[in-house]
Amino acid sequence: MERPELPIGLPEDIEEKKTAARNWFEGLRDTICASFEALEDELQGPLSDQEPGRFVAKDWSREEGAGGGGRMSMMEGRVFEKVGVHTSTVHGEFSPDFSAQIPGAKEDPRFWASGISLIAHPVNPNVPAVHMNTRMVVTSSRWFGGGADLTPVLSRRRTQEDEDSQLFHKAMEIACRNHAVADYDAYKAWCDDYFFLKHRNEPRGIGGIFYDWLHSSEEAGGWNADFAFTRDVGRAFAMVYPKIVRSNFNKLWTEADRDEQLIRRGRYVEFNLLYDRGTIFGLKTGGNVESILSSLPPVVRWP
């Protein structure tokens, strides 16, 4: 989807709106971390004799000359081989070349951005990998973006008919259908198009939703409507993914399953380093490199 021209100008209470968004993202982070630790405790299948994992939080600040920072929350456990749930709130100025690519930045290079980003790589190949992020960005305009997508690592489960796929799609559809400012069909198609490895001519996973530059008019509800939808995307993810994990994490797997998982993880690496918009944005704006690249899986194999 082509980047739209967004209206220039900010509401008088933009600082209060920034605070509300930041508080939401950080609260969602804490909710998800607690939920994932509960999954670590509940495991009864393979590897249940190992200690359950716990998140380790690490706060970071941007280097001198830039503003803001964030928190990395990483866990390595018996359910999640590697999972990161990160929040950040940063501000500064875009470089001249990057300003031309960002709505509202040509007029003024200053920006503010806050959001949550999550990628989970489970131990059990029967449990699909997942990605979710939502964010608010302010330049001389303002907008929300984000989404969630599911990546089954076993080819027999990587279909639209699979029960995990249907459950995930339904959760995202409900989150969209409940808000007039959202367009489920467009966001689903955008996700399919975005999470596609062009050099391999194949999708990364089974999709989900993806949206960006959400800036509704005041007649349509404005910032409040956009924020309400973005919150429901986070709530939908926090509800549906633990259900999918619980339905799969006690199943047995084979060495062949593990090999397939590691090869599929390689597709994650390729996408994140070649195409991922969040990775590019973070590196271009002086973000925390350790946090940005923590989305990469811990063990990968290429055939």
UniProtKB/Swiss-Prot annotation:
Pathway: Porphyrin-containing compound metabolism; protoporphyrin-IX biosynthesis; protoporphyrinogen-IX from coproporphyrinogen-III (O2 route): step 1/1. Its EC number is 1.3.3.3. The keyword Oxidoreductase applies. The active site is at H131. GO terms for cellular component: cytoplasm. It comes from the Bacteria. GO terms for biological process: protoporphyrinogen IX biosynthetic process. It catalyses: coproporphyrinogen III + O2 + 2 H(+) = protoporphyrinogen IX + 2 CO2 + 2 H2O. Its cofactor is a divalent metal cation. The keyword Cytoplasm applies. It is an enzyme of class 1 (oxidoreductase). Its main location: cytoplasm. The record marks H199 as: Important for dimerization. GO terms for molecular function: coproporphyrinogen oxidase activity; metal ion binding; protein homodimerization activity. Involved in the heme biosynthesis. Catalyzes the aerobic oxidative decarboxylation of propionate groups of rings A and B of coproporphyrinogen-III to yield the vinyl groups in protoporphyrinogen-IX. Belongs to the aerobic coproporphyrinogen-III oxidase family. This is Oxygen-dependent coproporphyrinogen-III oxidase. The lineage of its organism: Bacteria, Pseudomonadati, Pseudomonadota, Alphaproteobacteria, Hyphomicrobiales. The gene is hemF.
